[in-house]
């Protein structure tokens, strides 16, 4: 079933929807399909923590996500509101919005699966940790970080900073300090119990690392994002630098690529794994952790229910068959196996309903299967708002016709949404429904002639909908966060619905 929806992404504390952007070429076709197959083969997950946009170790993120298939999330304490602006006059909150969008753009290159922010505000440059803790309140920062860890539920935390004077900026030191403390706090249901009452569950990551170590110091893991990726056409570090160059308010778009190793050194500072499973030196962040899907319950430290192993093995077999059938010339050759894996995953989700931690990871796998299928099939979809009654251009110059002009809409106004869908893979698809998900009080009704329900490869299927805004729809959108006064060092979350 292919169901297309249009709507607003849910923002939880500071979760930003990266899917709002058009995919990069490297995330489509054969390259994109292969990278999504890598993600299906593992349950590895990492959360990288920083203080500001552009602090992140982008090469590390790109290597983890695109090179190993790990799920990668990025938690950035603030939005860099007190930085400089190389592009224009916007400063403070306005600059924070610009830097947020720049980071989300860069995240595409890093391969970040989820971007989070806390409620703290960049109040200006400070070399002192105590000033940052005084401005923000350590417990406030810790509460936000624990909430994000409990929301994302990563296996490993990797802090960009160490939490000491080597980090320089007081914001940097706070990010390092709080990450290490949040490692244990997130797994303790007695810490911030109001989050548990809201429906979150305590979550204990398995290991936490700090960055910024040097080759001649005590380090645990050495990573080389300078490795060349034939799927990207450059190294992971260079691909990440392309993303970093889009944070133009800070770097004016400068881009410097460099071949060769790009080593980064990270030190493990805490773990809940037994000493026998880890060593002074590790090859990866996941040494001592079985990241195969069949080991899901073992890795989650949960008793495996009867029949679970057979279900997990069925999913894994489907993934491995999809990998073996993968073809650069026809990525959709993997789709039949992926479809079986998706069905098996959905069955497992239903079977393990009493195991919420396992269901959480399996529902993530369900989404990964859907993404892999859509990418392998070359699925494209677009929904365009236009004035009601707009007709499609015809004739030999139709492809060069300008798009219809759609001005701002007001409460109670009716307009049209034209949805176009195409699947360009070899397997046939059947369209059960194309629908719009609209806002509260809005109405949407189908219009236009019905198209084929089993289109040929690359055949475009269109649907038109008449949409009427609610009479009490807000006249403008607004962020889900605000501060009452410029002196406030933390945002208040508001209902932006």
Regions found by a protein language model. Give the residues of each.
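Bacterial N-terminal signal peptides
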Residues: 6-19
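Active-site rim/loop-helix segments in enzyme catalytic domains that contact anionic ligands
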Residues: 20-151, 173, 177-184, 188
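The feature marks non-catalytic terminal segments
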Residues: 22, 32, 185-388
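Short acidic, glycine-rich surface-loop motifs adjacent to enzyme active sites
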Residues: 152-165
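Short, solvent-exposed loop/linker segments at the N-terminal edge
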Residues: 390-394, 399, 404-413
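Short beta-strand elements of extracellular/lumenal beta-sandwich folds
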Residues: 407, 411-426
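Short acidic, flexible loop segments centered on an aromatic residue
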Residues: 424-441
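Eukaryote-biased detector of low-complexity, proline/serine/threonine-rich segments
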Residues: 454-497
